[in-house]
């Protein structure tokens, strides 16, 4: 598939249907290697992200495609407001059920070790 064609039609779900989204990763890698194509892709990503931030009705599948393309080229996610990140897990846990049963054994397996923070920075 022509890389310029991919960039130009990434928004068109009729031309590049949603079931092809997973196969576009290799195309993104090739785009990232070409300086001109990656600049064109970044410009297009920024336009789509601006439309998203202005609530201009960007399809979530299209947004995910451009977010993936951006992260392949730039090496990090674009900080989108309101983007539903799939790896974010929010859960509340009541720890009392774990602590109350273990109250007599709390310090049995405690290991205290001094570590220099500069070793990890």
From Swiss-Prot:
Family matches, as InterPro entries: Swm2
Gene Ontology CC annotations of this record: nucleolus
Pfam families given in the database record: Swm2 (PF17083)
Highest taxon of source: Eukaryota
Keywords linked to the UniProt accession: Nucleus
Annotated compartments: Nucleus, Nucleolus
The family this protein is said to belong to: Belongs to the SWM2 family.
Name of this protein: Nucleolar protein SWM2
